[in-house]
Amino acid sequence: MIITTTGIIEGKPIRQYFGLVNGEAIMGANVVRDIFASITDIVGGRSGAYESKLAHAREIALEEMTEQARRMGANAIVGVDLDYEVIREGMLMVSASGTAVQI
């Protein structure tokens, strides 16, 4: 499965559009609290624990989106957008969306 943020895949014409696909992952309050509790992990202004949790949430959102596209018969997703939203106190949502296509 090819996944790209661009609207086209150079050298590979889009033969069919299937529509919007998306995936979400929500990090619960305990995860966020645990991340900030491990503030000693911060080196050079970056928190390895926080980045790891964000990467895992992003991976889950992309996997959900990819699986939805596969079920539609797509072999690529174009125009992918990743969003990070704080929802409620201490909860973070990562969402991925794009257009499922056949190339």
From Swiss-Prot:
SUPFAM superfamilies noted in UniProt: YbjQ-like
Top-rank taxon: Bacteria
Entries under InterPro entries matching the protein: UPF0145_dom_sf, UPF0145_YbjQ-like
Family membership noted in the UniProt record: Belongs to the UPF0145 family.
Protein name according to UniProt: UPF0145 protein Dred_2155
Species the sequence originates in: Desulforamulus reducens (strain ATCC BAA-1160 / DSM 100696 / MI-1)
